Amino acid sequence: ALPLDGDQPADQPAERMQDISPELNPLFHPVKRGCCSPWNCIQLRACPCCPN
């Protein structure tokens, strides 16, 4: 097996989450899944913690 070098999507779960639309991700929860991240504020402007 090849060593994990961090370049594969599976090695970067946090980054891979950003590739999944919150609406399509069954694990998405606006509070527990990092609603306040800049990416989610761009995609989900209704998040209460995002600037208007």
UniProtKB/Swiss-Prot annotation:
Residues 2-33 form a propeptide. Keywords: Amidation, Cleavage on pair of basic residues, Disulfide bond, Hydroxylation, Secreted, Signal, Toxin. One of its GO terms (cellular component) is extracellular region. It comes from the Eukaryota. It is found in: Secreted. Its main location: secreted. Expressed by the venom duct. Disulfide bonds join C35-C49, C36-C47, C41-C50. GO terms for molecular function: toxin activity. The modification 4-hydroxyproline is found at P38, P48, P51. The modification Asparagine amide is found at N52. Residues 1 form the signal peptide. The cysteine framework is III (CC-C-C-CC). Belongs to the conotoxin M superfamily. This is Conotoxin reg3h. It comes from Conus regius. The lineage of its organism: Eukaryota, Metazoa, Spiralia, Lophotrochozoa, Mollusca.
